[in-house]
Amino acid sequence: MASAPTSKYNSHSLENESIKRTSRDGVNRDVGETLPRLPGEIRITDKEVIYICPFNGPIKGRVYITNYRLYLRSLETDSALILDVPLGVISRIEKMGGATSRGENSYGLDITCKDLRNLRFALKQEGHSRRDMFEILTRYAFPLAHSLPIFAFLNEEKFNVDGWTVYNPVEEYRRQGLPNHHWRITFINKCYKLCDTYPALLVVPYRASDEDLRRVATFRSRNRIPVLSWIHPENKTVIVRCSQPLVGMSGKRNKEDERYLDVIRETNRQVNKLTIYDARPNVNAVANKATGGGYESDDVYHNAELFFLDIHNIHVMRESLKKVKDIVYPNVEESHWLSSLESTHWLEHIKLVLTGAIQVADRVSSGKSSVVVHCSDGWDRTAQLTSLAMLMLDSFYRSIEGFEILVQKEWISFGHKFASRIGHGDKNHADADRSPIFLQFIDCVWQMSKQFPTAFEFNERFLITILDHLYSCRFGTFLYNCESAREKQKVTERTVSLWSLINSNKDKFKNPFYTKEINRVLYPVASMRHLELWVNYYIRWNPRIKQQQPNPVEQRYMELLALRDEYIKRLDELQLANSAKLSDPSASPSSPSQMMPHVQTHF
């Protein structure tokens, strides 16, 4: 990692950077063109502060606080700096120093962010400036604690594409060839009474009645019964997801659950066994028996094979990411980098998640066996495994729209607890439910995109933009824990979808090397020597670390694509003009060669 001198430090997301460049298109500015504002964004206050920059030292600036962001612009001519931080990114706000503090810049605020950076501001001790800033930031960064709406409900942005229409479950299952004579669509969960964390529409075995489903639900954690996620277009094997069975210490059984899994097995008669992947380490699954959970024993589920994938729980992942932050922010120790990275175990966890997904995909595609995937409750590791396996198996999900559908389906509609894992608008930064499960998934996708650079329609900016708005609270896409809660809060009616932003600006998020391929299965190499830390995400706030610059070939290719599009547009305009003249009898006849100048597209 090479160091680079820097005279200008812009600490904001890629997406926010694009806002500044296109501020004439819907982003208001006030206070002498210093503050960008979204429609619905209101300026609350501004103060002069000293920003304790961990890279360039103390910098005098003015900080503006709105109901959406903290925005700082330096007042020093020799140090141009901008900080643009959505308040949803803030995890914790602490006061530093006391009334008797005498050290230089020792009195102010410490701000911890969810996107791996910290901010420190020094303020004057007189005039209650710290108290005022602390109270305002706390009020708008943690609106739920103050009976205020999350900004997404105040955002008045308009886009020419409605992102809420991207995912229609009926259309997505129809794309997969469902329903068929083995699988049916049921609306038994229409009012979320069968399972309050599942979507309203489910795909289940044709031979299983709704009453069977109710009986199975009593034996699955949180009533999360086995339901279909994906079906192979050729061999008709399926990926089914669910939660753990409620076996308990006494080894309870449920005949309906056993028969139900057998029915799933019989929808595909190419193999005699149903494969069950339990995402947990074996010891954890056994320990869960003490709290009423457990796993499918071979002694009971005779026609099933059980494999444990050794992926650790949310608490282990949270601690691992904390260690990553410790080694990447604010400074990177070059001399001990490899050992420091290894000590975080982050890439080990990425490896285990990818390895598990590869096993699922391979068993379905090559092994021709249907698989059931679960962890404890089926909304964390299960979502990682099913969505990554589907990404490997189905090229549709590797397009921009397909990936959006994958996230909407496997993560959002099936109840990954975004509110609990991220803590949108919640001041309880130490909540044990916080965990970077979705970040891990996106990291795995990035690892795949590095190994298969032509297989994905989207680029790195697309993935980083998704992660930025996982925290920002600008859009309603990731709010709440489940579909029933979103319906209750009318999220699709009252907020804007992140996919509206992305699909209105698709060219920014396209991979120029994308080659569309049908039915190509991707098997990434999940060994430690093929995995790497995502520098452009985890270390992007450090201006001394040289970021991975766009490939010159990629830049030239993008220029040629833009040139081609311009030529095609001109050609269409000329053809339209020619048609109009041909249809006008009063117009003088012109030969095609006169009307159509020679256009060469370089392709």
Swiss-Prot record:
This protein's record includes keyword Cell membrane: yes
Binding site for a 1,2-diacyl-sn-glycero-3-phospho-(1D-myo-inositol-3,5-bisphosphate): 288, 313-314, 376-381, 417, 421
Keyword terms: Cell membrane, Cell projection, Cytoplasm, Endosome, Hydrolase, Lipid metabolism, Membrane, Phosphoprotein, Protein phosphatase, Protein transport, Transport
Modification Phosphothreonine occurs at: 495
Modified residues (Phosphoserine): 13, 18, 588
Entry GO MF terms: intermediate filament binding; phosphatidylinositol binding; phosphatidylinositol-3,5-bisphosphate 3-phosphatase activity; phosphatidylinositol-3-phosphate phosphatase activity; phosphoprotein phosphatase activity
Active-site residues, Swiss-Prot/TrEMBL: 375
Principal subcellular localization: cytoplasm
Reactions the enzyme catalyzes: a 1,2-diacyl-sn-glycero-3-phospho-(1D-myo-inositol-3-phosphate) + H2O = a 1,2-diacyl-sn-glycero-3-phospho-(1D-myo-inositol) + phosphate; a 1,2-diacyl-sn-glycero-3-phospho-(1D-myo-inositol-3,5-bisphosphate) + H2O = a 1,2-diacyl-sn-glycero-3-phospho-(1D-myo-inositol-5-phosphate) + phosphate; 1,2-dioctanoyl-sn-glycero-3-phospho-(1-D-myo-inositol-3-phosphate) + H2O = 1,2-dioctanoyl-sn-glycero-3-phospho-(1D-myo-inositol) + phosphate; 1,2-dioctanoyl-sn-glycero-3-phospho-(1D-myo-inositol-3,5-bisphosphate) + H2O = 1,2-dioctanoyl-sn-glycero-3-phospho-(1D-myo-inositol-5-phosphate) + phosphate
Residue ranges constituting the GRAM domain according to the UniProt record: 29-97
Localization (cell): Cytoplasm; Cell membrane; Cell projection, Filopodium; Cell projection, Ruffle
Activity modulation notes: Allosterically activated by phosphatidylinositol 5-phosphate (PI5P).
GO biological process: endosome to lysosome transport; intermediate filament organization; mitochondrion distribution; mitochondrion organization; muscle cell cellular homeostasis; negative regulation of autophagosome assembly; phosphatidylinositol dephosphorylation; protein dephosphorylation
Enzyme class (EC, first level): hydrolase
Biased composition (Polar residues): 1-13
Low complexity: bias regions: 583-593
Protein's membrane topology: Peripheral membrane protein
Description of how the protein assembles with itself and partners: Heterodimer with MTMR12. Interacts with KMT2A/MLL1 (via SET domain). Interacts with DES in skeletal muscle but not in cardiac muscle. Interacts with SPEG.
PANTHER family, alphabetized: MYOTUBULARIN (PTHR10807:SF69), MYOTUBULARIN-RELATED (PTHR10807)
Family label: Belongs to the protein-tyrosine phosphatase family. Non-receptor class myotubularin subfamily.
Role noted for this protein: Lipid phosphatase which dephosphorylates phosphatidylinositol 3-monophosphate (PI3P) and phosphatidylinositol 3,5-bisphosphate (PI(3,5)P2). Has also been shown to dephosphorylate phosphotyrosine- and phosphoserine-containing peptides. Negatively regulates EGFR degradation through regulation of EGFR trafficking from the late endosome to the lysosome. Plays a role in vacuolar formation and morphology. Regulates desmin intermediate filament assembly and architecture. Plays a role in mitochondrial morphology and positioning. Required for skeletal muscle maintenance but not for myogenesis.
Name of the protein described by the UniProt record: Myotubularin
Source species of the chain: Bos taurus (Bovine)
Gene: MTM1
